[in-house]
Amino acid sequence: MSADPAEPVYRNPVLDADWSDPDVIRVGDDFYLTASSFGRVPGLPLLHSRDLVNWTLVGHALQRLEPESEFAAPRHDCGVWAPSLRHHDGRFWIFWGDPDRGVFQVNAPEIRGPWTRPHLVKAGKGLIDPCPLWDDETGEAYLVHAWAKSRSGVKNRLTGHRMHPHGTELLDEGKVIVDGDRIPGWFTLEGPKLYRHDGWFWIFAPAGGVETGWQGAFRSRAFFGPYEEKVVLEQKDTDVNGPHQGGWVRTPSGEDWFLHFQQRGAYGRVVHLQPMRWGGGGGTSRSWGSPRSSGAESGGEAESGGGWPVIGDDGAPVAEHRRPDLPPQPPAAPATDDDFPGGRPGRQWQWTANPRDGWATHHSADGLRLTCVRTPDAHDLRALPNVLTQRLPGTPCTVEVDLRLDDGEPGARAGLAVLGDAYSWIGLQRGPDGTVRLVHRFAETVADQERDAAPPRPAPGGRARLRVDIDAGARCRFSYDTGDTGDTANTADTGDGAGQGGFRPSGQVFAATPWRWVGALLGLVALAPTGQGHAGTATFTQFRIRIQEKRADR
């Protein structure tokens, strides 16, 4: 990448972690982004940027998932799907689909809140990926959404509605305005984003599936159609598989840009920034050729004309590109490290379900103090609601945290985990004799119970520094430092002087896996078997993520 200030460039992805199904807007000189959060809490992350390249996490719009009882336990593929972020009438609005309940919205006067409680706009099964539009030209409000076949038996179509201007309800039963089954070669049409531009209604919507899909654009002079379609972004001969589903944004100087995701296995859906322009008949076409009508009941062909969006390098994603014409900003990224001041986790952390009082204790010093929550599911971390998680970085990295297992009863344990359909964790557990041992366990995708990845080892003092080295294939190597100079076997020479004994490798290499729709997660957890009374606490300090391969200037 060039470092010449006269030709500054950025490199994709601009958000190298699982920020799934992004949508973006500009308000004044500020850009804001939100993403899917599924069953994690808090939900609806809110990111801010001044240059579309450097982003920081500034909060969440959804503090708890409703109904409370349904999200008391993990529901990793439920909850918040593919939100749309808009700014209208002086307020920020986020609409999303809960595939089991319907279309919801929250709104706020400022991006940091306060946000309203979720309002159900339309109840129904399988209503996903909603996007509103307040049309300044006509004064009307509209909403388009896709369908989840797993809940409704319907997919590959987009349904349009008239919406109350207050965004509180839909005013009709809806009409299919784009039927993917009528477009040769199109399948899994979803994720629509609705815009008004140059006298047209525009729907940017992906198709073809998460890993191998493409980005489509649809346009019509009337909201209810008929629409004609074009493929405007696809992999071509690049390394970016399935470049699709995201949002269009325009800078103050009039430049157009498109943010979208790429599915990268255990790393989840990382976010790319593509240049965009409006050209005469631009974009790309697949084997079915030129723009054509895709309305379900069009009654005739849509009006043709120029001015289609051209995204990336003539419809192919770019690996690097000239920066947007915006004031230079210092390098920034969503926070990962945490000292847990006052016992409070940073905003990058999310629980795997609605949290309960007492899981984390606030105090005057640094360090996250977690209660060893009693559970009948101590054999399977995937079933626990009290795992505190953050996203797995998309580049090779080293993750470390200090852990102290405080006074507790036999069976109390805590540790650092890499979670997905399969998982592995390393940590401390108190034995029947009251001593603390270093334990390392894992569970395969098909297993419903974990087992030892390495034999337990003594942990004098009930403390350890835990480490996971994660390479380019999301292969994880666990190690630990208990400060025990007597255990010199298999000592790893890390060269960082950590602890008197140094880090010692533990177990075999573990391949991180995604969950359904979600990339692998890093997790901190404290638990205990069922029983009566307080089971003890665990304290985590100095959580650090160190990127192993330095990227060029962003």
Please give the residue ranges for each predicted region.
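Carbohydrate-active catalytic/glycan-binding domains of CAZyme proteins
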Residues: M1-D487, D493-R554
